[in-house]
Amino acid sequence: MHFFPIQLLVLFFAEKIAFAENSDQTVSRVDSNRYSVAAEKKFLLYDVNFGEGFNLRRDVYMRVANTVRSLRDSGENYILVLPPWGRLHHWKRMEVALSWRLFFDLESLNRFIPVIEFEDFLDENRPIDQVIYLQHYAEGWGTEYVRKFEKRSCLPPAESHYKQVEEFKWKGWFYSYEDVYSRNFQCVSIQGDSGTLKDLLKHSNFSESTSIMVDRAETILHEHYGEVDYWKARRSMRYSNDLVDVADAFRKKYLDSDDKRDKTKLVDDWTKEKPRRTAIGGPYLGIHWRRRDFLYARRAQLPTIPGTAKILQDLCKKLDLQKIYLATDAPDQEVDELKALLNGELEVYRFTDTQKLNDGQIAIIDQYLCAHAAYFIGSYESTFTFRIQEDREIIGFPISTTFNRLCPDTEPTCEQPAKWKIVY
């Protein structure tokens, strides 16, 4: 056996690390069979403002996931802890502590960054070392946008969300878990993106903590919106196999649609996907018809119910389609009115099996079915619509069949949505 002076070993690994940084390899990805790079395992948790809905939270996941990717690329051995779903503003049933595996394929998520469920985190980590409560600067952005952060006094409503019950013991919502607490709590004013959050975690005294929870994670923006790493994170968010099976059975039974005929089959491993625009979709029109609170916030941008019926009739005639899949939050009486205005000329289908599935699972099935339609039309500035457009980009539809919106009666040729095309 040969022995080497410790100085040579240090130099050897320093050169390997330098090489990794210069060649787009990273310490986190060094082949553990060849090199021994000791990196302490760390956990990043996060939460989002209560008022944010399911689809905005999916977007925040991508921001935080790219923070973890960036941390790992810089040599930090971070694992992302997935925040349990529940108590969401738009959900009819106030369920809590729902795991991600009910909605998404965890194996697919782990192909982008390492993730674990909160329950699995609790099995070996309790309490949380540090809660960082993100907030905007009280004085605003100023005359220019500068990426920055600093510890500040807490602004409302931070202090109503977390209470110190004794030294090194802070209580908060923590996804409804009663027996979870944090040793430390700190408010941080931040102005920036995923990269700014990475700098906060890496280049401050927070770096000494092994488990950090970032609350109000929606405060940070995407560092590279619409670029390669954005789409890698998005492509990793495959839906759970159980939900896909339910949706596929529905589209085959009612919509004459399947992957082979529609040319919508995806490879099992998203990292092996190739650019394409060959998807045809099922012989039906997919529509996301946003109602309820949008009638107050976006009334000028929405068609009336008769206006919606006319749009659907005109589109189906133009596209030679007889079936419509309707994803909507509209009350039943509004759906009935819409169907009546279609005069039985078109078949309207909805997924309504609410007994076995929760609100979030039904939302995903709605999106999946709209994403597999030959043509899709959505609602103005709706994150639900955005997620469908992203799904269709991943599946590989022609752009003209995806980026379409319902126009108000007063502006039938309204401006159509921005075309955020997939990047590989």
UniProtKB/Swiss-Prot annotation:
Signal peptide as annotated in the record: 1-20
Protein's job: Catalyzes the reaction that attaches fucose through an O-glycosidic linkage to a conserved serine or threonine residue in the consensus sequence C1-X-X-S/T-C2 of thrombospondin type I repeats (TSRs) where C1 and C2 are the first and second cysteines of the repeat, respectively. O-fucosylates members of several protein families including the ADAMTS superfamily and the thrombospondin (TSP) and spondin families.
Name of the molecule in the record: GDP-fucose protein O-fucosyltransferase 2
Tissue: Expressed in the anterior part of embryos, in the hypodermal and neuronal cells of the head. Expressed at different levels in a variety of cell types after hatching, including neuronal, hypodermal, muscle, intestinal, and somatic gonadal cells. Expressed in the nerve ring around the pharynx, in dorsal and ventral nerve cords, intestine, and a variety of hypodermal cells of L1-L3 larvae. Expressed in gonadal sheath cells, spermatheca, and tissues surrounding the vulva of adult hermaphrodites, and in the body wall muscle and hypodermal cells of adults of both sexes.
Organism field: Caenorhabditis elegans
Keyword Signal appears in the UniProt entry: yes
Annotated compartments: Endoplasmic reticulum; Golgi apparatus
GO process annotations (BP): fucose metabolic process; protein O-linked fucosylation
